[in-house]
């Protein structure tokens, strides 16, 4: 049995990850953190898990060592505390954007600032198993690809392997949940339901 813990578990990504892991035969979820919900039952943030687990959220300071640590933090937070996280588990899977790009110069181009810890970026395997399975299996650190990049890559990879692509136009339609559970006028479902709006059409960082 693989003992896993989740950091940043009160958001949509953390909640869905927890749901998948709770029903995985090879994993046992030991801890899940949320500063906002610390001490409260997981179902207070994720009502769909009310009868699935008795876990309660804990703080980062309460985290104990585990086999695999899964990080679901906002952009920039993983790299800030990477030394702390790496001391807790020999294997880390990061669902944020902090280590997706293996080239610090490419990171600076897309994110508009230098990478805070450039010596680490090459240590992460790119986490799309359908195209990078062997590297992921051998890695101790994995950076999961973004949602738009995953959809685009999986759609185009078979064509690219056969050299059938001359040019590409990708038109992504994202629902209101893609913006996460932090409220804003742009992400408020009644405001955006049934509407189509362009969002950073030329320089969206999740293209990478």
What positions do the PLM features span?
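Oxyanion-binding "anion nests"
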Residues: 202-208
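N-terminal Rossmann-like NAD(P) cofactor-binding subdomain of oxidoreductases
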Residues: 1-201
């Amino acid at each position: 049995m693989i003992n896993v813990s989740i950091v940043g578990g009160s958001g949509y990504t953390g909640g869905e990850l927890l749901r998948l892991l709770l029903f995985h035969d090879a994993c046992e979820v030991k801890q899940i953190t949320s500063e906002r919900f610390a001490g409260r039952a997981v179902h207070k943030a994720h009502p769909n898990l009310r009868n699935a687990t008795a876990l309660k959220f804990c703080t980062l300071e309460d985290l104990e060592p585990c086999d695999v640590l899964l990080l679901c933090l906002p952009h920039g937070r993983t790299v800030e505390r990477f030394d702390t996280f790496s001391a807790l588990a020999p294997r880390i899977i990061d669902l944020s954007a902090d280590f997706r790009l293996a080239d610090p110069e490419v990171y600076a181009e897309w994110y508009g600032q230098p990478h805070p810890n450039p010596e680490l970026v090459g240590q992460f395997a790119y986490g799309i198993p359908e195209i990078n399975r062997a590297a992921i299996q051998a890695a101790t650190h994995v950076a999961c690809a973004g949602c738009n990049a995953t959809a685009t890559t999986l759609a185009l990879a078979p064509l690219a392997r056969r050299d059938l692509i001359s040019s590409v136009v990708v038109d992504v339609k994202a629902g209101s949940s893609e913006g996460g559970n932090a409220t804003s006028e742009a992400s408020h479902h009644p405001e955006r339901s049934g509407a189509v709006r362009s969002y950073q059409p030329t320089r969206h960082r999740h293209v990478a």
